[in-house]
From Swiss-Prot:
It comes from the Eukaryota. GO terms for biological process: regulation of apoptotic process; regulation of cell cycle; regulation of centrosome cycle; regulation of RNA splicing; regulation of transcription by RNA polymerase II. Widely expressed (at protein level). PANTHER family: CYCLIN. The keyword Repeat applies. Signal peptide: none annotated. Interacts with CDK11A, CDK11B, CDK12, CDK13 and POLR2A, the hyperphosphorylated C-terminal domain (CTD) of RNA polymerase II. May form a ternary complex with CDK11B and casein kinase II (CKII). Interacts with pre-mRNA-splicing factors, including at least SRSF1, SRSF2 and SRSF7/SLU7. One of its GO terms (molecular function) is cyclin-dependent protein serine/threonine kinase regulator activity. Residues 196-280 are annotated as: Cyclin-like 2. Gene3D superfamilies: Cyclin-like. Residues 310-518 are annotated as: Disordered. Residues 405-427 have a biased composition (Low complexity). This is Cyclin-L2. The gene is Ccnl2.
Length: 518
């Protein structure tokens, strides 16, 4: 039977790895199928190329996972015995049980016992073989049978399986294992059994009436399913070896000049090797499944530890990178601004709030801002430091800078006033009475107490005409303020520029409204 599948040019399908090459070499047509001017990948599936080459038989995937030969052979024997016992309880025909065991042997020559559960694959092979041989069984029955076999093997009282979440998970695992078997075998699940061949050969030898000989040869053939002879030799050679072994056991003479099996295409070397493999089963000790499962678990843990050690997850092992710096960037010693110009970096939100609250509390509790000269200089230096650390959005607008520079109060005064203006919080505008020195002095304390409770001003932007009028007012009143005492001048410097300017402006423009009515 040949099948061609479309795919990449010149590539072999990976699913044919389990049955791609046999003793006769590569099958013709496996290099591809030429359709028109394109070459499509081809898979030639025959009963001859289902045999495994010697290199796969000598070094199996289980050996690469760390299992020794005896442990792997014991697992193969136990798995085939489970399939045979489950088939008997499920009342499957012998052909279906033989198909399940052959599929089991083929699968574990492509996969490891360490990575795949032997019991789950056995259940999947029984369920798959029952459908292949047209004697299907429900997967629930297969699970119940294997559950009973496990309790009998452990010498426990059989208990019905509870239909809980564990049962659902087991059912899903068996379905996945069945799909995995089909994928690894390339859906080449047809098995040619030697049962009918034995009867046909005995008819040729005129020994079909000897029921004892027929039954003994049949028994040897069923026992040979636990070995690897079905993946190494043709069914005709296996049938001849079973007849030869049964005749030698029952001491029934058969033609030997020439040997009778040469008529059916078998060789003497193949007959001897098959007989040796079958007789080895009867000399082996009874397999302890618990010991085999413990060996498999040890190999699993060893592989997991090796993987974790390679990734650096275990304590005392170094990760793939030398240090944690490979996962996160190293901390910077200084900010970019400090490295470039030596200027301090802008403070964080909490530190900026603390710096703002300090001057506010001092101004709110001091009567008429009557601070000493040392305290005045400290507050001025603090306001300057805060104005330097402010972001550009909090500084004065260009128009206000222009008006400050145009004033006659001097460059140093305007510079200090602009800095203190940027640091002062916004105020709500109130309309007051015309300016009177005595009233301002008397009500200054009440104004400072109300300062913290006032709502912020909605907008800081003012028109250029207002700034020009303010500058004119400052120049007109400069002479008037100079006549006052130095004590009042120091107080005026300490107060924020915006507060005094807004008070003068609205008190002069709107004489009918006063902030403190009497």
């Amino acid at each position: 039977m040949a099948a061609a599948a479309a795919g990449a040019a010149g590539l072999m399908a990976p699913a044919s790895a389990a049955c791609s090459s046999g003793s006769a070499g590569a099958a013709p047509g496996s290099q591809g199928v030429l359709i028109g001017d394109r070459l499509y990948s081809g898979v030639l599936i025959t009963l001859e190329n289902c045999l495994l080459p010697d290199d796969k038989l000598r070094f199996t995937p289980s050996m690469s996972s760390g299992l020794d030969v005896d442990t792997e052979t014991g697992l193969r024997v136990v798995g085939c015995e489970l399939i045979q016992a489950a088939g008997i309880l499920l009342r499957l025909p012998q052909v279906a049980m033989a198909t399940g065991q052959v599929l089991f042997q083929r699968f574990f020559y492509t996969k490891s016992f360490v990575k795949h559960s032997m019991e789950h694959v056995s259940m999947a092979c029984v369920h798959l073989a029952s459908k292949i041989e047209e004697a299907p069984r429900r997967i629930r029955d297969v699970i119940n049978v294997f559950h009973r076999l496990r309790h009998l093997r452990e010498k426990k009282k059989p208990v019905p399986l509870v239909l809980d979440q564990e049962y659902v998970n087991l059912k899903n695992q068996i379905i996945k294992a069945e799909r995995r078997v089909l994928k690894e075998l390339g859906f080449c699940v047809h098995v040619k059994h030697p049962h009918k061949i034995i009867v046909m050969y005995l008819q040729v030898l005129e020994c079909e009436r000897n029921q004892h000989l027929v039954q003994t040869a049949w028994n040897y053939m069923n026992d040979s399913l636990r070995t690897d002879v079905f993946v190494r030799f043709q069914p005709e050679s296996i049938a001849c070896a079973c007849i030869y072994l049964a005749a030698r056991t029952l001491e029934i003479p058969l033609p030997n000049r020439p040997h009778w099996f040469l008529l059916f295409g078998a060789t003497e070397e193949e007959i001897q090797e098959i007989c040796f493999k079958i007789l080895q089963l009867y000399t082996r000790k009874k397999v302890d499944l618990t010991h085999l499962e413990s060996e498999v678990e040890k190999r699993k843990h060893a592989i997991e530890e090796a993987k974790a050690r390679a990734k650096g997850l275990l304590p005392g092992t170094a990760p793939g990178l030398d240090s944690a710096a490979g996962f996160s960037p190293a901390p910077k010693l200084e900010s970019p601004k400090e490295g470039k110009g030596g200027k301090p970096s802008p403070p964080s939100g909490k530190s900026a709030k603390r710096k703002m609250e300090g001057p506010k509390k001092a101004q709110g509790h001091s009567p008429v801002n009557g601070l000493l000269k040392g305290q005045e200089s400290r507050s001025q230096s603090r306001s300057r430091e805060q104005s330097y650390s402010r972001s550009p959005s909090r500084s004065a607008s260009p128009k206000r800078r222009k008006s400050d520079s145009g004033s006659t109060s001097g460059g140093s005064k305007s510079q200090s006033r602009s800095r203190s203006r940027s640091d002062s919080p916004p105020r709500q505008v109130h309309r007051g009475a015309p300016y009177k020195g005595s009233e301002v002095r008397g009500s200054r304390k009440s104004k400072d107490c109300k300062y913290l409770t006032q709502k912020p001003h909605k907008s800081r932007s003012r028109s250029s005409s207002r700034s020009r009028s303010r500058s004119r007012e400052r120049t007109d009143n400069s002479g008037k303020y100079k006549k006052k005492s130095h004590y009042y001048r120091d107080q005026r410097r300490e107060r924020s520029r915006s507060y005094e300017r807004t008070g003068h402006r609205y008190e002069r423009d709107h004489p009918g409204h006063s902030r403190h009515r009497r």
